[in-house]
Amino acid sequence: MKNKIKSTALATLLTGTALLTGTLPTGSEAAESPFAVAMEKMEIDGLNIAYREAGDPDNPTVLLLHGFPTSSHMFRELIPELAAKYHVIAPDYPGFGASDMPDAASYDYSFANAADIVTQLIDAKDVDDYAVYLMDYGAPVGYRMFAEHPERVTGFIIQNGNAYEEGLRDFWDPI
């Protein structure tokens, strides 16, 4: 038992030292490896929006939209697996994860606003088209993005996604 405690303490010390001395990749350094996941922030509409990104931007992009009450953290094991073949972006909506949480009295926490924020993020990342994985709360966000720009979405992966009539456009009427 003493050896296990010593081993754990040593591993913790070495990891902490590596983080403090900058010998572990972070930020843009981490993004250079297709398997490393960079946690970044971008200012959009006055809010700091957090997102995880990995993989080669020249590869097809997969956008991962989280549910409620989660964040991009839920994809932490999936992102490195996808990054071998895809460029992966997983944002945190306003009020979720590491993104800013504006006061509800002054900010409209709607699916439309979340979709707009994510669209601005992928525009700033120069992503022209993407496949989207969505679930739960991410479904109405992703559906709104598709309704606005169907030409950009190359495919859907839907897990337990809800489709609400509220907010859907005339685009869906023929279906």
What would you call each of these model-derived segments?
Residues 2-61, 84-86, 127-128:
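Alpha/beta-hydrolase fold catalytic core
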Residues 30, 171-175:
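Short, intrinsically disordered, charge-balanced linker/junction segments flanking boundaries
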Residues 40, 64, 89-90, 133, ...:
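Conserved Rossmann-like nucleotide-binding pocket used by diverse enzymes
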Residues 44-45, 52-54, 90-135:
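Active-site loop/oxyanion-hole signature of alpha/beta-hydrolase fold enzymes
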Residues 47, 53-101:
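Conserved HGGG/HGGXW glycine-rich cap/lid loop of the alpha/beta-hydrolase fold
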Residues 76, 119, 143-147:
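Short, hydrophobic alpha-helix immediately C-terminal to the catalytic nucleophile
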Residues 85, 127-169:
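Conserved hydrolase catalytic core segment
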Residues 100-103, 167-172:
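Short aromatic-enriched loop/helix-cap "lid" or pocket-rim segments at secondary-structure transitions
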